[in-house]
């Protein structure tokens, strides 16, 4: 009787494990990102990814709409050793389930910009009042609605370099801050969990710090307008430099008292080729990790601006460039600090109240009140993202991959499964649709998911072993 009882309990525990989600969500705790299950700090070690440039987004395609292209590139992401990609533009009217599932299985998270170059899908930095309307907000909300249902969506960027010169600094700041709050209100009303909203700043010392302080500050009337994280686009470390000659020491000091997570949303100067990426060793060292939460190298694919890690050839093959190998050698040797270490080194700060003015910025603006409130109340119509059952063949690529010398690359041609998706991952969205009253429960469930990929096969084996005791 005792054997039966213990075996029965074990069987129940295994079934519970199989029904819990495997893809851990990432949330913000103090000034860093944290894995909600393990409690370990999450440092961004990634690349910016927009094959063909932002102009390649259309009604028919975007970077996450082609599963074959995703399989080809995600296995190369794994070869680099990254854990995050940033994508600048997508079309929410396309299906992204296969590519997001592949990223999740590969253990890779997404930071997604909500704007696109298509009409009515971005802010006019010089005349934002002409574009900040309900048509634009509907596009933004559709992006948020769709991607908030993937556990590996790490965060959203409300804008990229919208403020980048004297003229835009006079007109755009207030609209960016308003957009951040409006997005957060929509997430609070409709998303299954809280997903942070940030901004990616231009590499311009005239505005970078003052804009960060303005977007950070808390207005008593609209506390939700405070940014959740801040991205810095920086290209000041070129070739062989030091913290002092590159100006990184000044950069770190500028954000030392910032109350939100800060990271490089773009980095990797290309004035010296091949790029050495020497700054990565410092970025994840004690000199910087108390202030910066990692970064994203610009960029994965070779475009006209010559920052690529790989180059797509006319015959559909892909060639790894010298920068790819350099970045790989640095990323694969990174060790993240522990939470204990961070607590000993990170200076915690309170979010400041808003000041009356900020250097080089004009923050007064007459933005229409309650714009988007009706959309927030009723929600937008878009296909909600969900993980799908991916066949093993879909994780492989038949594309010819060449090394930097033009010879056939002898690396893997298949995505390595690092997170096996469970029934909860694959069916969670259907359950949410069936019972909207369980939203609060779902939020708790997603934030308390506990099984990681390698444990799932073990759980299955133990489950079958348990059954064998009876038959």
Curated annotation (Swiss-Prot):
Gene Ontology terms, MF aspect: 1,3-beta-glucanosyltransferase activity
Class of enzymatic activity (EC top level): transferase
Positions of the catalytic residues: 161, 266
Binding site for (1,3-beta-D-glucosyl)n 1: 88, 160, 298
Signal peptide positions (record): 1-21
Lipidation (GPI-anchor amidated asparagine): 447
Disulfide bond residue pairs: 70-99, 217-354, 238-269
UniProt: (1,3-beta-D-glucosyl)n 2 binding residues: 161, 203, 208
Membrane topology: Lipid-anchor; GPI-anchor
EC number: 2.4.1.-
Known function: Splits internally a 1,3-beta-glucan molecule and transfers the newly generated reducing end (the donor) to the non-reducing end of another 1,3-beta-glucan molecule (the acceptor) forming a 1,3-beta linkage, resulting in the elongation of 1,3-beta-glucan chains in the cell wall. Involved in spore wall assembly.
Family that this chain belongs to: Belongs to the glycosyl hydrolase 72 family.
UniProt protein name: 1,3-beta-glucanosyltransferase GAS4
Gene: GAS4
């Amino acid at each position: 009787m005792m054997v039966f009882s213990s075996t029965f309990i074990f069987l129940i525990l295994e079934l519970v494990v199989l029904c819990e989600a495997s893809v851990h969500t990432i949330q913000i705790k103090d000034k860093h990102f944290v894995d909600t299950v393990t409690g370990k700090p999450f440092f961004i070690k990634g690349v910016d990814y927009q094959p063909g440039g932002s102009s390649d987004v259309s009604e028919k395609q975007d970077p996450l709409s082609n599963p074959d292209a995703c399989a080809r590139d995600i296995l190369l992401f794994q070869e680099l050793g990254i854990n995050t990609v940033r994508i600048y533009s997508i079309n929410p009217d396309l299906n992204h389930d296969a590519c997001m599932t592949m990223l999740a299985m590969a253990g890779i998270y997404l930071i997604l910009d909500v704007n696109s170059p298509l009409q009515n899908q971005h802010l006019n930095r010089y005349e934002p009042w002409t574009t900040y309307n309900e048509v634009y907000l509907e596009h933004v909300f559709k992006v948020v609605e769709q991607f908030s249902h993937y556990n590996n969506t790490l965060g959203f960027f409300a804008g990229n370099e919208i403020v980048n010169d004297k003229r835009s600094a006079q007109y755009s700041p207030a609209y960016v801050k308003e957009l951040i709050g409006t997005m957060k209100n929509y997430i609070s009303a409709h998303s299954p969990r809280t997903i942070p909203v940030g901004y990616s700043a231009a590499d311009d010392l005239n505005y970078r710090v003052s804009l960060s302080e303005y977007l950070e500050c808390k207005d008593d009337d609209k506390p939700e307008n405070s940014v959740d994280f801040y991205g810095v686009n920086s290209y000041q470390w070129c070739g062989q430099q030091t913290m002092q000659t590159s100006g990184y020491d000044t950069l770190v000091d500028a954000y030392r008292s910032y109350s939100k997570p800060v990271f490089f949303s773009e980095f990797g100067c290309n004035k010296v080729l091949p790029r050495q990426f020497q700054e990565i060793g410092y970025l994840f060292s004690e000199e910087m990790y108390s202030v910066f939460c990692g970064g994203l190298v610009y960029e994965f694919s070779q475009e006209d601006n010559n920052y690529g890690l790989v180059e797509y050839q006319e015959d559909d093959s892909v060639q790894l460039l010298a920068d790819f190998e350099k970045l790989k050698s640095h990323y694969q040797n990174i060790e993240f600090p522990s939470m204990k270490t961070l607590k000993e080194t990170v200076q915690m700060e309170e979010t400041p109240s808003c000041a009356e003015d900020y250097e080089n910025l004009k923050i007064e603006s007459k933005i229409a009140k309650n714009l988007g409130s009706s959309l927030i109340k009723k929600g937008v119509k878009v296909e909600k993202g969900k993980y799908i059952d991916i066949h093993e063949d879909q994780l492989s690529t038949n594309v010819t991959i060449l090394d930097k010398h033009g010879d056939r690359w002898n690396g893997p041609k298949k995505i390595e499964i690092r997170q096996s998706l469970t029934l909860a991952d694959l069916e969670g969205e259907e359950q949410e649709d069936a019972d909207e009253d369980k939203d609060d429960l779902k939020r708790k469930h997603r934030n308390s998911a506990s099984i990681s990929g390698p444990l799932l096969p073990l759980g299955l084996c133990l489950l079958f072993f348990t059954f064998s005791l009876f038959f």
